[in-house]
């Protein structure tokens, strides 16, 4: 089901939750063995090329964090950025697996900031990591740059609610809010965009291969909608009759008197357009907008 809103144009200023610099002779081989996406195309490209988007998984294949990995100035320099996954989490996850690798990880999050241009982006100065992000707008471009640098902001300033509405309408999960340590990538359809099945070994790869062979999971992240105000506290459990079938994990006002959200629900006990409640046996309060 498609959900359409009027598409704004302008800019949104934000701070990355993580911006890490990874250097050393073993940087590529180390990251390649930890990241769910293939980094060889990134390493072969020049600085300023598109990054790889992927996941940092646990041994059991659960989602610990996500991120974009960028090529730096040299073949042994990479940068890791994330909208929502925090730098200490990613750094601890990586450093926990450094054994004899010649790799250094620096947290530079506080020194960098971000901007999203919605619509036409202006020319980008040298030193800005510009890329096609995961915002959900038909046309947008992200940039991450040092706080002491200057970039052009084109058009009107967009608020967080507008950006969040586009993300949720496009069913793009925020990691770890919508898909986190208790979830498999496939449950949020992240396997389609954030996982390589051909790159070879990485942490969590065996689980991902088994999931691909199985072809299905028991839960799915879907869009939901309701009338009135969004849930006051998240995550919010949802029920089909007396049975809890999932939880709403993110929500935003839809701009038309209701709200839109993402919920992780069981696909054994729910169907598209099902009416759900926020309490066991309670009144209908929301509807599934996608088939689980």
Model-based region annotation:
Residues 12-34, 106-120, 216-226:
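Short glycine-/aliphatic-rich beta-strand segments at the starts of folded cytosolic domains
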Residues 26-31, 87-91, 121-125, 148-154, ...:
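Short, conserved charged micro-motifs
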Residues 10-12, 18-19, 68-174:
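Acidic, low-complexity central loop/insert segments
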Residues 53-57, 118-127, 229-243:
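Short amphipathic alpha-helix segments
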Residues 1-7, 56-67, 99-101, 123-131, ...:
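Short amphipathic beta-strand starts and helix->beta connectors
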Residues 144-225:
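Anionic-ligand-binding alpha/beta catalytic cores of soluble enzymes and soluble regulatory domains
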Residues 1-66, 73-74:
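Acidic, proline/glycine-enriched N-terminal capping motif
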Residues 183, 188-195, 205, 209-292:
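Glycine-rich, small/acidic residue-mixed loop/short-helix segments
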């Amino acid at each position: 089901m498609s959900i359409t809103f009027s598409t704004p144009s302008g800019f949104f200023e934000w701070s990355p939750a993580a911006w890490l610099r990874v250097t050393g002779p073993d940087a590529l081989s180390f990251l390649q063995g930890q990241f769910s996406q293939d980094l060889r195309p990134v390493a072969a490209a020049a600085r300023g090329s598109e990054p790889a988007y992927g996941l940092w998984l646990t041994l059991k294949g659960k989602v610990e964090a996500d991120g974009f990995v960028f090529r730096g100035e040299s073949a042994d320099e990479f940068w890791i950025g994330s909208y929502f996954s925090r730098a200490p989490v990613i750094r601890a996850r990586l450093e926990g697996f450094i054994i004899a690798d010649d790799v250094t990880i620096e947290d530079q999050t506080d020194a960098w900031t971000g901007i999203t241009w919605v619509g036409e982006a202006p020319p980008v100065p040298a030193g800005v990591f510009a890329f096609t992000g995961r915002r959900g707008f038909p046309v947008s471009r992200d940039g991450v740059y040092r706080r002491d640098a200057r970039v052009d902001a084109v058009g009107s300033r967009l608020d967080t609610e507008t950006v969040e509405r586009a993300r949720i309408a496009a069913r793009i999960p925020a990691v770890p809010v919508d898909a986190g340590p208790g979830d498999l990538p496939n449950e949020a359809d992240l396997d389609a965009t954030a996982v390589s099945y051909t790159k070879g070994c990485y942490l969590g790869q065996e689980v991902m291969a088994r999931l691909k062979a199985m072809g299905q999971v028991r839960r799915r992240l879907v869009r939901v909608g309701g009338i009135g105000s969004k849930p006051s506290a998240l995550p919010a459990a949802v029920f089909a009759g007396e049975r809890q079938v999932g939880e709403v994990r993110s929500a935003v006002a839809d701009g038309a008197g209701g709200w839109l959200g993402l919920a992780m629900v069981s696909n054994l006990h729910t169907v598209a357009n099902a009416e759900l409640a926020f309490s066991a046996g309670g009144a209908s309060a929301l509807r599934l907008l996608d088939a689980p």
